Amino acid sequence: MKTLNETTQQSTRAGRYGKDFGGQYIPETLMTELEKVTKAFNDLKDNPEFKAELNDLLVNYANRPSLLYYAKNMTEDLGGAKIYLKREDLNHTGAHKINNVIGQALLAKHLGKKRLIAETGAGQHGVATATIAALMGMDCEIFMGKEDTDRQKLNVYRMELLGAKVHPVTSGSMVLKDAVNATLQEWASRSDDTFYVLGSAVGPAPFPEMVKHFQSVISTESKQQLQAKEARLPDMVVACVGGGSNAIGSFAAYIDDPSVQLVGVEAAGKGVDTDRTAATIERGSVGIFHGMKSLFMQNEDGQIDPVYSISAGLDYPGVGPEHAALAQEGRAQYVGITDDEAVEAFTYIAKQEGIVAAIESCHAIAYVEKIAPQMAKDQIIICTLSGRGDKDVASIAKYKGVDVDE
C-alpha cells in the first residue's frame, strides 16, 4: 500500500503558490474525494445561498464580527506605534478556528457527509469541529497527539463533552504532525461518509485555498474596522504562524496592499539555532509532506525532524504553501519568538490590557513588544489575538514553577 507521503499524483498549476509550492501529493485512493471537495468548494464559495448560510452562522453563532480593539495601555507603555488587537479570542469557542470549521462543515453537509474528522494541536480546532458537529447533528472524531492530550486535558474533556470521540495518537513524536497523519489515514480508509475538516492552511489543494477563504473574514473585517476608526490602512499586520491559518486569514485582505508590512511570528522554542524549535520558515527546506510541497523541518534524507514549542498550536514541522511563497517573494517577513519571550508576553498583555491570550497569540504579542517602540507614533500595527488563554494558564504556571490545581 502506498503511504500518504508518497508522490502518487501531482496537480497542475491549480493549488500552486509562488514558484512551486502547494499542489496535491497524495495516494490515488484520495484523488476522487479531493476532486469532489474541490468542485463543491468552487461551486459553492460564491453561491449567494451558501454565502448567506455561512454569514448567518458567523454572525449569529460564532459572534462575528470580532472586535478591533485599541490597546491603549500597551501603546502608551511601549511608546511607539498605535496598537490594535483583532480579537479572535472573543469568537464562540475562543479562537479563530471556528471561522474555517463552519465553512468546511457546510461544504460537508452539501456533499451529504454524516461524519466530521479533524486533527488538533492545542485542541482549539478540535473543540470548534466538535462544536459545529454537535450543532449540525453530525458524528465527530478528533485525532490529537498524546503529548498534546497530556498538556491540553481541559480541551480533551471539552471535546468529549460536545460528543466527539478523541483519539490520542501515540505514533511518531505524538504531536500535531502525527495527528495529521492519523487523520489522513482515517479519511483514506473511510471517505464515503466522512469529511476531513483540516484546521490549518496546509495539506493538498484545495485545503490551503479553502482555509484561507474561510479565514479571510479576519482581515476583511479588520480592514473595514480600521477604515472606520482611522480612515487608513495599517502599517503592519502581525500574527503567529504554525501551519498558518490565522496568519493567512489576517494577511489575506492586505496582500495586494504593498504599503502594509506583513509579519508572521513562528515559535522559536528554546532558540532558532537549537534543535528545540519550530521556526520552519527560518530553518526549514523545501520538501513534500502531508500532501503538499512547502518548507519543512527535515534532515538531509528528507525525513521530518521533531519540532518543539511551548505552544501545542505552533509545533508543526511545516508551514502552509502560501506562507512559503510569501516568504520566498519577500511579501511577508517571518520572525522567531522563544518560549521565554512568549511567556513574558502572556503576563504582559494580561497586566496591561486585562486579556488572557493564548500562548500561540502571545508569540505575536512578544514581537509587537519589540517592534512597536521602533516605529513612529503615527504608525499603526494590527496584531491578531488568535485565541484566548484559559487553556494555557495551568501550563504557564507550571513553566514558571507555580503549583496550581488544574
Swiss-Prot record:
Stored NCBIfam families: trpB (TIGR00263)
Organism of this sequence: Lacticaseibacillus paracasei (strain ATCC 334 / BCRC 17002 / CCUG 31169 / CIP 107868 / KCTC 3260 / NRRL B-441) (Lactobacillus paracasei)
Residues that bear N6-(pyridoxal phosphate)lysine: K97
Keyword list, A-Z: Amino-acid biosynthesis, Aromatic amino acid biosynthesis, Lyase, Pyridoxal phosphate, Tryptophan biosynthesis
EC annotation from Swiss-Prot or TrEMBL: 4.2.1.20
Pfam families hit by this protein: PALP
Described purpose of this protein according to its UniProt entry: The beta subunit is responsible for the synthesis of L-tryptophan from indole and L-serine.
Entry-linked SUPFAM superfamilies: Tryptophan synthase beta subunit-like PLP-dependent enzymes (SSF53686)
Lineage: Bacteria, Bacillati, Bacillota, Bacilli, Lactobacillales
Gene3D superfamilies hit by this protein: 3.40.50.1100
Cofactor(s) the record lists: pyridoxal 5'-phosphate
This protein's pathway: Amino-acid biosynthesis; L-tryptophan biosynthesis; L-tryptophan from chorismate: step 5/5
Protein name per its UniProtKB record: Tryptophan synthase beta chain
EC class of the enzyme, as a word: lyase
Similarity-based family: Belongs to the TrpB family.
Any one GO molecular function term: tryptophan synthase activity
Entry superkingdom: Bacteria
Recorded GO CC terms: cytoplasm
Reaction(s) this enzyme catalyzes, per UniProt: (1S,2R)-1-C-(indol-3-yl)glycerol 3-phosphate + L-serine = D-glyceraldehyde 3-phosphate + L-tryptophan + H2O
Assembly and oligomerization: Tetramer of two alpha and two beta chains.
